[in-house]
Amino acid sequence: MNRTVFFVSESTGITAETLGHSLLSQFDTIDFEQVYMPYINTDLRAKALTQRMQEAADRDGVRPIVFATMLNNEIREILESGNCYYVELFEGFVEPLSRELGVPPSRKSGRSHAITKPSYYTKRIEAINFAMANDDGIRPDNFHRADVVLIGVSRSGKTPTCLYLAMHYGLRSANYPVTEEDFERGDVPQLVWDCRHKLFALTIDPQRLQLIREERRPGSSYASLARCQDDIRMAAQIYKRLQIPVLNTTSQSIEEISSHIIKALRGSGEH
């Protein structure tokens, strides 16, 4: 079953996207066609969007879902009048919270990031830069500066997890790909061993890994099931030798994987 979903906001749309994704993740039997519509901040843009909603309804045979964070009543009414199932993610909470706090809301869009301390914002930017500069084992000599180091076979989810940890937690995250060279010697370089206390392994079911690799290199030996099975098996032997935590990414979201890592780091006193 296919369903079109619009993420709509007067500002960047990050809040609508984040909350909407959390809700949609509970319905994994449906394929969602996701459309991002930030800066819908005029009547004209809102009316144009209702036309797109109608087109989606005509195409899919069912009305689209709209996740929105609209504080402008006029624009919200235009969107609600469209052929859609409208989910307002702010308004149901703003008024009750206003009554509890005893002050009126500012009704300004794009304010969800304003409460973040500048120092934390800077930390996240630095962490993102670190993750990008230390992706795919480019600089193992920098691992000692990392808060966390992920290890895993190619396409096991290392890079997106590192970026998520950087963006949402401000963690300096690096990763190291386990390669044929490591398999041949049955071990990883000393620089990886040196950071074993902050090392996490990512594994994945061979069948799932094959599908992911097939998208990248169709018909290649790299994407064959036999190669995927061998890579996972030999990597598991290395993880056992290192005696590090192993997280299976097959059926877990990046958010779930990251939460496990954060919990482990806090339990160890690293963060």
UniProtKB/Swiss-Prot annotation:
The chain's disulfide connectivity reads none
MF (Gene Ontology): ADP binding; ATP binding; phosphotransferase activity, phosphate group as acceptor; protein serine/threonine kinase activity
Signal sequence, renumbered to the chain:
none
**Pfam families the UniProt entry points to:** Kinase-PPPase (PF03618)
Q: Which InterPro entries match?
A: Kinase-pyrophosphorylase, PSRP
Per the UniProt entry, the Enzyme Commission number(s) are 2.7.11.33, 2.7.4.28
| Enzyme class, broadest EC rank | transferase
Keywords in alphabetical order, please. Answer: Kinase, Nucleotide-binding, Serine/threonine-protein kinase, Transferase
Q: What HAMAP family has UniProt attached to this entry? A: PSRP (MF_01062)
Q: What does this protein do?
A: Bifunctional serine/threonine kinase and phosphorylase involved in the regulation of the phosphoenolpyruvate synthase (PEPS) by catalyzing its phosphorylation/dephosphorylation.
The record's comment on protein family reads: Belongs to the pyruvate, phosphate/water dikinase regulatory protein family. PSRP subfamily.
Protein's name in the database: Putative phosphoenolpyruvate synthase regulatory protein
What organism is the protein native to? Thiocapsa roseopersicina
